[in-house]
Each structure stands twice: as structure tokens, then as C-alpha cells.
Amino acid sequence: MSIVLDHVSKRFGAHVALDEVSLEVADSELFVLLGGSGSGKSTALRIIAGLTRPDEGRILLQGERVDHLPPQKRGVGFVFQNYSLFQHMTVGRNIEFGMRIHKVPHAERLRRREELLNLIGLEGMADRLPRRLSGGQQQRVAVARALAYQPAVLLMDEPFGALDVRTRSQLRRSLKEVQQKLKVTTILVTHDQEEAFELADRIGILERGHLVEVGPPASLYRRPKTELVARFLGEANLLVGEIRGGRLHVGESILTLPAEAPQVTGSLEVKVLIRPEELEVRPRGASIDGKGLGLGKILETLQAGPVLRMKVGVPSLRGTPILSPEPVFGQAEPTLIAHALPEIGELPVLVPGAPVQLAVRNLHVIPHEGGSLLVCIDGSELAGRSLDFAARVAAQMHGRMEILGVAEKPNEETRAREGLSAALQGYSSEFPSLKTRLRAGNAGDRILEELDRGVYDMVVLGCRGRHGPARSMGSTTGKVVMQSRVPILIVPEARRSLKKILICMASGVSGRSDVIFAGRLAGRAGAQATLLHVMEGDQPGLPGAAPDPRTTEYLRELTTERLARGILTLKLMGVPSEMKVRQGVAAAEILEEARSGDYDLIALGALEPPRSEDSDGRALIDVVLEHARRPVLIVPAPQEKGT
């Protein structure tokens, strides 16, 4: 293997950039590391080049360990996004720069320079200065300079990111030709999926410092092993189905089970991936090739060049969990996405509102995992309650648990270790892949660090922290609530089951992300849900003035409409639900409804997010935690992509 990364890790302060990444790249291979911002892809490249030192792990190039070697002795060529050409040097001297450092003879430098200029399509431009070249031409020179002294490995960090679309496409083709002719082992990092698919022999998907999956582009797209990759690459229809009796059941339909699907004797819940181009949409009554998925109605269309992109409502899938596309708050019926190259005669028929029939040409089955819970404990009584309830929730979600022990003081480590040991002994039979780890220091900081390095769907707080009672938003809970991107479950008192969930849509509290997340939890647990909205006593108006009846009536209508949309969302998920409206102080009314209705869980939406001690949202959460006699789920507001 030309390049080997062996359990490489890198941290920048509390941020984990790479977490035990292992990778092998074959001789002459063009390997693409694909990931979003902050995934760790550029860090991996810099570590291979010797520009950044890893905290742990080994780097091997051409079979030789190079961790200790400086960049200039690793035999690596590096191409940056911003060209990094010497502006005072001609194109020829830029290309020769590395060869001069390596003391290559003059005649050999000229021969190699002209060979590379011809290869990159810039013959005759050796005497030009970089400022007289276009961006695409400058990047070609940067590639030639990196290849000039014949490195064993070529590393490219978003090399086409600063170029326009047309130039990027041309350069991708040129790079592929050059790489294949020279047979130089190459790693390119990018966030551009089209670029990755066009160039790569294999792709590695990086997410939060984890190398999630590696494979040829077509295999990763059509047969991913994980939900994360299925959703990350392109668009996806991802539904929950069941293999039963050797057949695949999705909603009311029975679909053809792929040959590579697991063979089971009883039944097995799975995720069903249907790419938009594999979903056949035809006018009702027309002949159809795939396996029938039912009748539907076109909701939206968009002509993107020759491809017709459609959103299609499919009533027969009502109650079937659809993981992608994400449900929209208030959506009345299940929606799938389809891409088609329709025949000319079909174009006037495939329009919004048109009744259609759907069929599946090809699909892929992914093992179903119901979610990942991070349970944080400190060996206290609160930790025991939280762990017990978290285990029940994880079991009902068909998910997995990881347990983080936190010791804020050195004399607390023994208790934390004992708690972890007892947890491993008590729950490993139910969760065979159960992992535990111990962290010392501020509980809130350690929890947030673990959330940053792992991919979790929920965090369960079973540690008090040094300040604040277990029932209030003390330092640990407050810090995690304000900064966590995943829902937080706090267990002041445990319940024996999860059959009734109260989802609060009180004034000032987010009412979309919490409805969708709590609805998914209710669907997995087979629980009923109640949507609650609290009308505050004070209405908008002049100070001291009586409430305007027209304003009050308008707010009631708005509340009813909002609750009705929430009920539609829950019904779409197959969750039995009802709505209630109370009037008064939000926290008091939530607590009274929870008590009188004997709910097993209260779900609250955090503000966007609460960032100060005086935040109304934080005050409401604090009061509910102080007096609730049941678990409380706090769902953060969704963050903008890229944050």
C-alpha cells in the first residue's frame, strides 16, 4: 500500500478533529476523502504531508513509517486550493522550484518541465507570469509543480474550490488523465459530491473525525452500509420496512427483496433505501415496470435540465416511518421524491395535482439501528435512575447505548469507576456492544466534548455537577442544554414505562423540532402523544389596558391551527395523538397537565437556544425540572446548516 493511516487521532483543544482513523490507499489509486466542513478531511491530509503532527497513530508511505520525518523528506506533493504560486516567478520557474531544491540537473529540469506543460495543456507558456493566467491555468501549474520532482504521493486539498463550475469540470477531466498517465497515488479532499464521484477510484466518507465508510463510488451510492452515508450521498427515500416470510413489507406493499439482503427465519426491521431515479412515477393506467408501491399524487415539480424532479404524496405509506425526506411540520401525507426522464407525451400529465402510480425498480436494505444514546453518569443515585430509564428507552427504540462516567474531582473517580463497572455488568447482556469510558474534569465540558466526537441522537444526563441540585438547571445541565445540538433527557424520577408523552408547545417554546423528535420517539416506543399549548394570561396591548378580544380570538385561532398541524405531523408518523389548550402560567400549566394526565415523559423545545441566565426559555425549563416527577426531554432548536 502506498499510504497507510493506522489509528490516527488529532485534537485541537477540546475539539476532536480525527478519531482513530485507519485507512489504506493502494498504489496508483486516486482516493477521495469526502466530508462537510469540520469533518477532519483537511487535517488528515496535513498529517500525511507532515504539516500537522498527530496525537496518536502511525503514518506509513511506501511501507516506511514517516511520523518523525519533516514534510520535505516524505516524498509528497501538495496542491492547495489557493494555488500558492510564486507570483514573481515565471510558470517555468514555478514548476522547476521543487526540482531545484532537490538539485535535479538543469537538462533534466527542462525536460521534465516541458513534459508537464504538455501534459497539463500549457505548452509554450513557460515564460509567462502567474498573474497573466486564468484561475484554472494557475491551478494546472500548481499541479505540475507538485508533480515535477516525481513524488510518490500527491495530496490535493480542495484544489478546484476557488474556480467556476465550467473550469472545475474541465480541470477534473485533466487531472484524471494526468493521474492515470503518471500512475501517482493521490488523495484529494473535497466537500463536492459530483467532484468525488467523477474522480475517485474509491471514496472515504468522513463525519466528525470518524471514517464512516469506504468504497467505490457506485457501491457507496447504491449499496451504503449506513443510514448516514445513504442520506449524505445524493438524495434518498429512506423508509422503515420489515423482512417477513422471505418478503419485504413496506407500508401496504410487498417489494422484491434484494439478493444481498439478510436471510431471516422470523421477522427483521430494516431501512429501505430507494434512490429518486429508482422510483418510477407514471400516469395512472400506464404500464409500469417496477414493483408497485401504490397510488399517489404529484405535489411539486421542478425541471432541472432533462430531469424532472418530483415530490409525490403517497397516502398508502401513512404510518410508515419515513426517515428521508425529512417530514415537514404540518405535512398531511407521506412524501417521496422522484427523478425522471419522462417521455414527451407524459410531460403535460406529470404536473402538480396529477394522480399517479408508483413502483420501485431497485432498492437497497440497510440494517436498522434505532438510534444512539450517550448516558452520562457519576455513580450517584441520579445516575442509577437515569441509566435504568435510558436502557428502557434504548430498548424500545431498538437502539444502542454508550456510557460516559464523569468525575469532577480526583476523589470522585473511584465512585465513577464503580458506577461504570456496575453499568457494564448490569446492561451488557441487553446491549452486547455497550461501551464505557471515564473522563475527569468539569462534567458539562466533558459531556460536550464527547458529543462533539461521537454521532449521537440523544444525551441522557445522570450526573449532578458541582453546582445546583439534581432537579434544577445547575451548571452541568445548563451548559449542556445551551450548547448541545442533540436532545437532552433528564430523569428527576424514573418511570416504569414510556406509554404517554406530553409534548409542550407553550408560548415562546419551539414547536416544530420537538414535535418531530418526540413523535419519532413515541412511534418507536408505541406511545401516545398529547400536544399541549399554554395561552399566557397577558396578551399584547398597551400597559394596563384590557386584552383586545379580537387579538385574543386571533391568537386562539392561530394556536388551534398550529396544534392541528402538529397533530397531522404525528399522525403521519403513525402516533396516536390529541391536542389540549390550557391558559395560565406556562410552567405551572405544563406541570399540572403532566400530573393529572400521569404522563411518562415531558418534551420541551429549547429556545434558539437560551444563552443567558435570564432567558425565559431557561426559566421555564428550570421550573419544570425543579417540580417534575417524571423524565424531561429538552429538544434544541435546529441549527442552520454549516454552523
Regions found by a protein language model. Give the residues of each.
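Glycine-rich, Arg-bearing micro-motifs that act as flexible, cationic patches
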Residues: L461-K479, L498, L601-H627, E640-T643
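Non-catalytic connector elements of ABC transporters
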Residues: A236, R247-G370
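ABC ATPase nucleotide-binding domains
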Residues: G75-G77, Q81, L85-L228
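Helix-to-loop junction immediately C-terminal to a conserved catalytic motif
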Residues: A49
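The feature captures the beta-strand-to-loop junction immediately N-terminal to the Walker
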Residues: L34-G36
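ATP-binding/catalytic-site motifs of ATP-hydrolyzing domains
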Residues: R58-L60, E64, H210
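Small/aliphatic-rich secondary-structure junction motif
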Residues: G370-S421, G426-L434, K500-P549, I567-K580, ...
